[in-house]
Each structure stands twice: as structure tokens, then as C-alpha cells.
């Protein structure tokens, strides 16, 4: 899997049990997950599994927030060296390394990668999530934070449309 190829030190089947442990700790812990799509070895089915997996974690209430991006191989990383060696880089224009567009060659068309990233964000925007966030309001600062979050969320959706 991608987690293995990137040496993340965790298997996909460990993610949900670990999140359950975090949630059982109580308090105000709010797990955040980052999901990336667009690896050169990733099939459309793999990427769709990432979307579905994330959506399932949200449905179960195991994550509170997420970041979805198209993978970017930054200079100095193993992925960048591997991408350079295997001719996976589409560009070396650093202005384009902002996670808003595919930089790596992928078997998945660019438009589809953008749509998948957008779908990851949309997977969290459920009635339960909105209701939970509204119930969490305790102060004016919470309301301001939620408005800023909604603005950022809409901005992310627009980035990937």
C-alpha cells in the first residue's frame, strides 16, 4: 500500500483502532487526518478507496477534521528523489507546488484527481458533522472560529473545482 511505500510506520488496518483509542480518551481531543491522492502508483480504485475510507471514519465519528490534497513531492524528500529518478515530475516550476494541481504523473487524469480531492472534503460535510459543530459552540470565539473554518472549507472546495 501507499503507507508502506512511504514508510509511514502504520498499516491501514491500524488506523481505525488507533482512532478509537484516541476518541475513548475523552476530553476535547479532535483527531485530524490528512489524505493525499495522486501517487504515480495509485490506481483510480485505490484513490476511491481513500475517499471511501475517509468518509467511513467521519460517519463513525472517529475524526473531527481533515485535510485533502494532491500529493506534492517536495525537494529533499525521498518521494522527490524517486520522482526525479523515475521521470514522474510534470514540472520543476516551484510556483505550482502548492497542492492545488497534480505535479506527479499519475494513471488518474488530472481532472479526476481534482474531483477526488474535492470529494474527500465533501465527505466530511454531513448533517451529523454540522450538528456536532453547532452543539460545540460555547462562546463568541467558537462562532468566529466556525465562520473562519467555513470560509477555509469553501476556499478548499474552490481550489479543487
Walk through the language-model features, giving the residues of each:
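Membrane-proximal basic amphipathic "stem/tether" segments
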Residues: 122-161
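A structural motif corresponding to the C-terminal lobe/cap of the Radical SAM core domain
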Residues: 1-138
Amino acid at each position: 500500500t501507499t503507507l508502506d511505500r512511504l514508510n509511514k510506520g502504520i498499516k491501514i488496518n491500524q488506523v481505525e483502532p488507533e482512532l478509537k483509542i484516541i476518541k475513548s480518551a475523552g476530553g476535547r481531543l479532535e483527531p485530524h487526518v490528512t489524505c493525499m491522492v495522486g501517487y504515480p502508483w495509485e490506481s483510480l480504485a485505490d484513490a476511491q478507496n481513500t475517499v471511501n475510507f475517509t468518509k467511513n471514519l467521519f460517519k463513525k465519528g472517529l475524526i473531527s477534521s481533515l485535510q485533502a490534497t494532491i500529493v506534492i513531492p517536495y525537494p529533499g524528500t525521498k518521494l522527490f528523489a524517486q520522482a526525479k529518478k523515475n521521470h514522474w515530475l510534470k514540472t520543476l516550476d516551484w510556483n505550482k507546488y502548492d497542492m492545488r494541481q497534480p505535479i506527479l504523473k499519475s494513471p488518474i487524469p488530472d481532472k479526476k484527481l481534482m474531483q477526488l480531492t474535492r470529494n474527500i472534503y465533501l465527505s466530511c460535510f454531513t448533517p451529523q458533522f454540522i450538528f456536532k459543530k453547532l452543539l460545540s459552540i460555547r462562546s463568541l470565539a467558537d462562532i468566529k472560529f466556525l465562520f473562519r473554518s467555513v470560509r477555509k472549507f469553501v476556499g478548499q472546495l474552490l481550489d479543487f473545482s
